[in-house]
């Protein structure tokens, strides 16, 4: 298992007055491992109050946080999910406050019980079967390959791709080369 410190205690963030009142009395920890581009905090330790997660996105990541809020609202009709406690959107920022789901992450279970990998895979498969059992005709969202590639190309054309963030194998490659190599791997191209 990785020995990365998965979260770090941090000071309370200042937000707008409506949200600040809801967050008074919580201890804060910042997530160190997410890859979404958002800043994520776990809020805990407030007596008689649920553990919460606060996600903040800026710029294009604010759109992703907004999309997550919309999808959570929709998906609650099909399965238990975190409750959205608060959502704030400004032209450049989005803040999403949700309850935490009780339990442990797959990573936490694997750290505690290294021999449980097969059980974790089985549990994830059950969850994915449930998710995939939702009829596609009920889903109002589009995130197919064509849509995502168009988003990626737009980001590339607007200079929003950070080439210094490429993996070791593609370190030093120009963005256009990564784009061309990725297209060679696409199914049905």
Functional labels for PLM-detected ranges:
Residues 1-36:
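N-terminal charged segments
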Residues 3, 7, 116-119, 170:
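A general boundary/transition motif marking the beginning of the first structured unit of a protein
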Residues 7-21, 133-189:
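An alpha-helical support segment within catalytic cores of ATP-dependent transferases
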Residues 13-25, 71-81, 189:
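Short charge-dense sequence patches
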Residues 29-144:
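ATP-binding pocket architecture of kinase catalytic cores
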């Amino acid at each position: 298992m990785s020995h990365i410190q998965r979260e770090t205690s941090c000071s309370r963030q200042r937000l707008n007055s409506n949200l600040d009142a809801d967050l008074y009395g919580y201890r804060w920890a910042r997530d160190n491992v997410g890859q979404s581009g958002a800043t994520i905090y776990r809020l805990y330790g407030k007596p008689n109050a649920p553990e919460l997660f606060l996600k903040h996105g800026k710029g294009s990541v604010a759109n992703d946080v907004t999309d997550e809020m919309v999808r959570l609202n929709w998906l609650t009709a099909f399965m238990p999910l975190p409750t959205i406690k608060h959502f704030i959107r400004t032209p450049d920022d989005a803040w999403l406050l949700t309850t935490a789901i009780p339990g442990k992450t797959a990573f936490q279970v694997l750290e505690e019980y290294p021999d449980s990998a097969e059980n974790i895979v089985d549990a994830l498969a059950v969850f994915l079967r449930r998710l995939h059992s939702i009829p596609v005709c009920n889903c109002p969202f589009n995130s197919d390959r064509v849509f995502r590639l168009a988003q990626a190309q737009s980001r590339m054309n607007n200079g929003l791709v950070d080439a210094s963030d490429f993996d070791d194998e593609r370190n030093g490659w120009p963005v256009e080369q990564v784009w061309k190599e990725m297209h060679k791997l696409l199914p049905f191209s």
